[in-house]
Regions:
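Bacterial N-terminal signal peptides that target proteins for export
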Residues: 1-12
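Bacterial N-terminal signal peptides
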Residues: 10-20
Length: 215
């Protein structure tokens, strides 16, 4: 049975910031097939790219859920994240979060997100974890030394596969808020997204969450 809750958190978007600087066709383009499938497409009228990444992580859905719910700790394991905190709860049962990214070559970026947990994996390991987020860039004033991201939305979906593994779908769209060198865009499409999924996997496996026995 799905545990239905509404809570907020902030995902990593560094890969999207690096990837969004290069235009292309408006159909999905597969840029990687291993270790994860990664697809990209430009969003019309913006500098943003839609990113779709999915694949198997060697951690239980409960472990991954625990890692992704703890937005305040993203700075400890997510690539490029230098600051992450929960700002305040929201009236709908969610929360507002703040994240600052320290990126190579380009200026630091930050974003404020209103993120909701739509469903959770139960203690027995059944169900699906789903989290969605959307930027609220004007929730409080921007910092003078950091570029504020205004378009940032996406979702996580985690389904248990058994034997301590999970299938993860990570979708997001981010406007980079400025020019991004081509080599960084290419890295963002592949390496940074892969690094994010691997970071989540590593963090999840390190957490003391019991993995339900296989049925």
């Amino acid at each position: 049975m799905l545990g239905m809750t509404r809570r907020w958190g902030a995902p990593l978007v560094a890969g999207a910031v690096l990837a969004a600087g290069v235009a292309g066709a408006q159909e999905w383009e597969t840029v990687a097939t291993s270790p994860y499938v990664i697809k990209v497409r430009p969003r019309p009228g913006t500098k943003a790219k839609d990113i779709w990444a999915e694949g198997e992580l060697k951690a239980s859905a409960l472990q991954i859920q625990t890692a992704l719910e703890d937005q305040g700790s993203y700075r400890l394991f997510m690539p490029y994240v230098k600051e992450s905190r929960v700002v305040r709860p929201t009236d709908d049962g969610g929360r507002l979060t703040y994240t600052r990214l320290d990126l190579p070559v380009v200026s630091s970026r930050d974003y404020i997100c209103h993120v909701v947990t739509e469903s959770k994996v139960a203690a027995d390991g059944t169900g699906v974890y789903q989290q969605r987020w959307k930027a609220e860039p004007d929730a409080f004033p921007a910092r003078r030394d950091v570029v504020r991201l205004r378009l940032n939305e996406g979702s996580w979906k985690v389904e248990p596969k058994g034997e301590g593994t999970s299938w993860v779908v990570y979708k997001f769209t981010v406007d980079p808020a400025g020019s991004v060198p081509g080599f960084l865009a290419n890295m963002g499409q592949k390496d940074a997204v892969v690094d994010t999924l691997r970071a989540v996997e590593k963090r999840a496996k390190s957490l003391g969450v019991d993995t339900p026995p296989s049925k």
